[in-house]
């Protein structure tokens, strides 16, 4: 066995390696894009929850400044809702 490798075989090997690297890069880019989309969705969900909590807190704070009669009426409506 001579250990001689022709130039064509080396070029073919390099081409195969380049193809594998290209596929790996595409797969990595796809995974990164999917992760970024998931992170944006999660962030939007968290922001929506925070927004709802802020609105509820704002309602409660406003209620503290109302007259006792208005608070009593508000509690009835709020319990029904």
UniProtKB/Swiss-Prot annotation:
Superkingdom assignment: Bacteria
Classification via Pfam families: DUF5446
Protein's recorded name: Uncharacterized protein YppD
Gene: yppD
